Amino acid sequence: MKTIIVFLSLLVLATKFGDANEGVNQEQMKEVIQNEFREDFLNEMAAMSLLQQLEAIESTLLEKEADRNSRQKRCLGENVPCGDFPCCGKLVCQKTFGYGWLYKSPYCVKPSNG
């Protein structure tokens, strides 16, 4: 009988202190969950900030690439029939003796020095 009383008293004490620890555990779990949500929120905010920075860098690079890809109008090289299109660089659109008599159109040639 004495052993049953001892075990019952231990059961009551364990239940009482177990409930107290459970309340503490619940508070600790709430704190842990809140900290995790804060960390997740901060990580998400950092990721969003990083994403915005990357988008800004990407837009500047795309602008530079668009500027680089925009080129002058196409031009014609040396000994190519010209007319509607301009000749490149220092070439001039002239009727020449060599090709002009055959095709009856001017050609892009280097300007003569004289």
Curated annotation (Swiss-Prot):
The record's keywords, sorted A to Z, are: Cleavage on pair of basic residues, Disulfide bond, Ion channel impairing toxin, Knottin, Secreted, Signal, Toxin
Q: What do the Gene Ontology cellular component annotations say?
A: extracellular region
Q: What does this protein do?
A: Ion channel inhibitor.
On whether Secreted is a keyword of this UniProt record, the answer is: yes
Q: Which cysteines are joined by disulfide bonds?
A: C75-C88, C82-C93, C87-C108
Q: InterPro entries from the entry?
A: Toxin_22
Would I find Zinc among this entry's keywords? no
Write the signal peptide boundaries.
Answer: 1-20
Identify the tissues in which this protein is expressed. Answer: Expressed by the venom gland.
Annotated GO molecular function terms are: sodium channel inhibitor activity; toxin activity
Entry domain remark: The presence of a 'disulfide through disulfide knot' structurally defines this protein as a knottin.
As for subcellular location, the record says: Secreted
UniProt-recorded name of the protein = U17-barytoxin-Tl1a
Q: Which family does it belong to?
A: Belongs to the neurotoxin 14 (magi-1) family. 03 (ICK-30-40) subfamily.
Task: Give the propeptide segment as residue ranges.
Answer: 21-74
One Pfam family this chain carries? Toxin_22
- Organism, as annotated: Trittame loki (Brush-footed trapdoor spider)
